[in-house]
Amino acid sequence: MRDARTARADDYGLARLKVSASPLYLREAEVRRGVDLLQLGQSHLLRAIDPLLREAAIGRAHYRMLGHVTRWPGLAMGDLIDLSGTSKQALTRVARELEERGLILIAPGLLDRRRRELRPSEAGTALVAQLEARLAAVMAEAYAGAGQDAVTGFWQVLEGLVPVASRIRMAEWERGR
């Protein structure tokens, strides 16, 4: 018999379990359940890339920054601080470590030389592609089990968690590509 760490969903008859939110979905217990599931889901999702992160000698914070820099090349440190809510000190340390490992390039801005812009290196872009392929496989499996309507609802909830100002900035960065 497997323990909870090695059990498959089918062992518990959960593979096709469909859950439905209570009509009282704004009650504290329901909201807490959503927070718990979000945190647990994120933890398990990121475990899929932990072996690649260890191999690259970087952590999850490094991956988050590298992912943003790859998605929006030319972001400044200030942009990343606004996006992530992380302190300048913490981001500077992570950026320096990524630069030392040859995964990002930090250079003065093209229009404003005081602005430090971050861009992925070829190695950084290749690593992000590997990491995101693993994450996509895990997400695709979860999406397939949930269905299109559930995925749409999930996206709506996640977008609701991102402040409007951040969503606007992200859209601007997308257009600026």
Where are these regions (language model features)?
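Residues at secondary-structure transition points
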Residues: 25, 29-32, 36, 40, ...
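DNA-binding alpha-helical recognition surfaces that contact promoter or target DNA
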Residues: 93
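Charged, amphipathic alpha-helical coiled-coil/dimerization segments
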Residues: 12-13, 96-159
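N-terminal leader segment of winged-helix/HTH proteins
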Residues: 1-56
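N-terminal helix-turn-helix DNA-binding core of bacterial DNA-binding proteins
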Residues: 36, 43, 47-90, 101, ...
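Short, charged, intrinsically disordered terminal tails
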Residues: 26-27, 163-177
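Hydrophobic alpha-helical core bundles mediating ligand binding, dimerization, or RNAP-core interactions
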Residues: 31-53, 128-147, 151-165, 169
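Membrane-interacting alpha-helical segments
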Residues: 20, 31, 118, 175-177
